[in-house]
């Protein structure tokens, strides 16, 4: 993206025609992003100065950066002294730049001495990470965007790319236009816009992907469609998996998944016998209590057929945020260390300790996202530091999340937007820079690293996230409990490039080796990793030689069982509730929600239901319904949709407490879609099951309705709306 500006004001954006990821194309969100930077908007939304309050019932008062960090570090030092370093938790974001991520990872795991740092990428990508590592040996997507145009079969699972990855979806449309024989298979409970373009749509029941993939592999085995030579030469463990999948007959797949046997056979045939099959998959696989098994079972299909390590083929996980990949590279998850090292590996811990000038880094596993907030809700974690993410909207089971935010003794929110829901729970607000103001790097789904450059100076007193991390480290170093380690560690980086250089050196000899890549080279063009010292360019696709980063050099088949969803539907809660993206909104809408034209596609929240369910509940479009789970209840308009099967319900994930009111079962106010989602997570990846919750749906007969409209000055409208939202929570439905 190219940002246009006049002085300190962003005035426009356009796609970069030379960038190999998008070739100048922008989605609706990207093309309108500059509108969220208009002065009349930012005056109402941006956090511009540090703010502090003594009690959460008090109003915030402006303070200086020095005093703000003194307040924070004094409390952190006190808590660590009394309760140990694991009483502190940091929750960061896939929208940080790689350099920001690196500093906070080093700060928390090195200086503070806890592995309690996790990222909202846990909500979107950790199952993909675990699946790749379980089967291929490393968290490294083996394919690239170019492979879309080279494939003979595209298998799209758990991804509505038309909405979630619209520029990539344009590539799919172009590939089909250039090669009408290209077969497109979409496995998704909903008939999305992506599924509507498919040659074959597999409308499986939520959570049954492992059974589907096992059933496809059984069909391949029975018909001789597996690549025995590839299996023999480049893999291990196939016999154990083969025994598992032989029980997954077409009849059983039909029973569990709801897929007709003919569709199963067709999908298996196209996948296996095509010259090159590329899988594209996203949150439908990842956001599951079986997320790791889903990912690994799909990778198994590629290994069994040899559709990996060649043009147009491979299992290609699509990332959910701009720099989810960069966070994985620096070890920004609670179970990882820098450069794809494993926290559980003592050799890896020693390598990172040497890099950071320490005797050791802590070995105790850190709390992952859901675990961290559960620990805070139980009083185990006393301090929560939240950067560039909005857990008071985006985390599942908001009852638990809000209890955590209320019980923590100190909540620091490092944020660019004062309108984010989590700000209301903070003791200390720290203003951070946002897009257009930041310098550093990001990595996309195809391992391509891109330089990010600032177009305008920081707004107000906002600081870069990496600077906040360094200043925090320097303030902590004044306390005796941190001083010995601080004297051994380097937190004196003068710019993002200095951080990048240390991160780059940490990758030497690793699967993502970027020792051959510098800021100077990134000024010329983005590059894919690995790009080791001496290389002139990065690597397009991985494993072309059939050698994998495992102890044996072979990829692994794992005998995984199909396990149903964590919360099965039953008579009291008969509907399967699913969440996902809208085309024109982004995450919690702190930016896109300020742009009026982006509400043109979907103007208000609704729960989508099958026509049969609408009829049985005596509902018409727009009628209000209670959607209730074991955690709480919300009220929303019902909308008929033929995209869903009976007894399924869908709502967009973006609608927070500013749009949807709700209550928990003790009648305490909750809000947003995640008032009813479950915090159950995959035991391997710890990623929560946001794609299914058991709910009941009942018509809401409210006593009165009011529709009010007003024309408001543009420089006041958002502020007035924000004030109104604090009152909307008192009504059963207000939007």
Predicted regions and their residues:
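N-terminal export/assembly segments and adjacent metallocofactor-ligating motifs
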Residues: 1-225, 233-234, 241, 247, ...
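N-terminal leader/propeptide and maturation segments of large enzyme subunits in energy/redox metabolism
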Residues: 55-62, 223-261, 338-351, 356-360, ...
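Flexible, glycine/charged-enriched surface loops at secondary-structure junctions
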Residues: 83-87, 226-231, 278, 309-316, ...
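Conserved short loop/turn motifs at secondary-structure junctions
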Residues: 89-97, 256-259, 282-289, 321, ...
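Extended redox/cofactor-interaction regions of prokaryotic respiratory oxidoreductases
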Residues: 102-173, 180-187, 210-214, 302-425, ...
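Flexible glycine/proline-enriched surface loops and loop-helix/loop-strand junctions
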Residues: 154, 197-198, 247-251, 280-285, ...
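Short beta-alpha connecting loops at secondary-structure transitions
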Residues: 196-204, 431-433, 437, 447-459, ...
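Long, contiguous, secondary-structure-rich segments that constitute the structural scaffold
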Residues: 459, 465-525, 592-608, 612-735
């Amino acid at each position: 993206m190219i940002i246009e500006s006049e002085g300190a004001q962003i005035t426009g954006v356009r796609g970069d025609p030379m960038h190999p990821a998008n070739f100048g194309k922008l989605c609706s969100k990207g093309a309108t992003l500059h509108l969220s930077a208009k002065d009349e908007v930012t005056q109402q939304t941006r956090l511009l100065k540090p703010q502090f309050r003594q009690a959460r019932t008090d109003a915030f008062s402006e303070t200086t950066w020095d005093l703000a960090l003194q307040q924070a570090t004094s409390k952190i030092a006190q808590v660590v002294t009394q309760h140990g370093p694991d009483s502190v938790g940091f929750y960061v974001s896939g929208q940080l730049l790689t350099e920001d991520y690196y500093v906070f990872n080093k700060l928390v795991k090195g200086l503070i001495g806890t592995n309690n740092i996790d990222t909202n990428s846990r909500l979107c990508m950790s199952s993909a990470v675990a699946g790749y590592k379980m089967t291929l040996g490393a968290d490294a997507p083996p394919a690239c965007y170019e492979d879309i145009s080279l494939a003979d079969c595209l298998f799209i699972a758990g991804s509505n790319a038309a909405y979630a990855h619209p520029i990539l979806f344009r590539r799919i449309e172009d590939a089909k236009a250039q090669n009408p024989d290209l077969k497109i298979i979409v496995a998704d409970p909903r008939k999305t816009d992506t599924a509507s373009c498919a040659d074959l749509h597999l409308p499986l029941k939520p959570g049954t992907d492992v059974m589907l993939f096992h059933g496809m592999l059984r069909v391949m085995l029975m018909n001789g469609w597996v690549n025995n030579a590839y299996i023999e030469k480049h893999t291990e463990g196939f016999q154990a998996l083969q025994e598992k999948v032989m029980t997954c007959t077409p009849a059983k797949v039909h029973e569990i998944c709801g897929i007709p046997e003919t569709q199963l056979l067709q999908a298996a045939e196209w996948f296996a016998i095509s010259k090159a099959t590329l899988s594209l998959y996203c949150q439908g696989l990842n956001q599951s209590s079986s997320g790791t098994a889903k990912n690994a079972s799909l990778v198994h299909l590629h290994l069994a057929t040899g559709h990996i390590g060649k043009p147009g083929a491979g299992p290609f996980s699509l990332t959910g945020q701009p720099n989810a990949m960069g966070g994985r590279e620096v070890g920004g998850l609670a179970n990882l260390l820098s450069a794809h090292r494993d926290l559980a590996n003592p050799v890896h811990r020693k390598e990172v300790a040497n890099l950071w000038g320490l005797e050791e880094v802590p070995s105790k596993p850190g709390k992952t996202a859901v675990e961290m907030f559960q620990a805070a809700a139980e009083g185990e974690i006393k301090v929560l530091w939240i950067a560039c993410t909005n857990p008071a909207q985006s985390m599942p089971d908001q009852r638990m999340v809000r209890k955590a935010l209320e019980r923590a003794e100190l909540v620091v929110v490092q944020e660019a937007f004062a309108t984010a829901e989590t700000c209301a729970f903070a003791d200390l607000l720290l203003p951070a820079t946002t897009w257009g103001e930041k310098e550093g790097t990001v990595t996309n789904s195809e391992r391509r690293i891109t330089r990010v450059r600032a177009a305008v100076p920081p707004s107000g007193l906002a600081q870069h996230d990496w600077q906040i991390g360094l200043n925090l480290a320097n303030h902590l170093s004044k306390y005796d409990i941190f001083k010995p380690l601080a004297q051994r560690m380097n937190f004196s980086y003068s710019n993002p490039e200095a951080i990048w250089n240390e991160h780059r050196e940490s990758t030497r000899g690793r699967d993502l080796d970027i020792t051959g890549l510098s800021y100077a080279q990134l000024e010329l063009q983005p590059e894919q990793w690995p790009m080791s010292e001496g290389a002139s360019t990065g690597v397009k696709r991985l494993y072309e030689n059939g050698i994998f980063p495992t102890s044996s050099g072979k990829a692994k088949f794992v005998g995984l069982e199909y396990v149903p969803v964590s919360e099965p539907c039953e008579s009291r809660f008969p509907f399967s509730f699913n969440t996902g993206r809208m085309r024109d909104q982004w995450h919690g809408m702190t930016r896109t929600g300020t742009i009026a034209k982006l509400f043109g596609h979907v103007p208000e929240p609704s729960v989508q239901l099958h026509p049969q369910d609408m009829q049985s509940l005596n509902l018409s479009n727009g009628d209000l319904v209670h959607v209730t789970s074991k955690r709480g209840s919300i009220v929303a308009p019902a909308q008929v949709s033929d995209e869903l099967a009976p007894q399924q319900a869908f709502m967009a994930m973006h609608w927070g407490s500013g749009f949807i009111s709700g209550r928990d079962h003790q009648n305490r106010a909750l809000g947003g879609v995640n008032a009813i989602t479950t915090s159950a997570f995959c035991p391997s990846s710890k990623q929560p099951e946001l794609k299914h919750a058991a709910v009941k749906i009942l018509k809401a007969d409210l006593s009165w309705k009011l529709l009010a409209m007003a024309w408001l000055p543009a420089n006041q409208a958002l502020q007035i709306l924000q004030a109104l939202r604090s009152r909307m929570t008192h009504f059963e439905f207000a939007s």
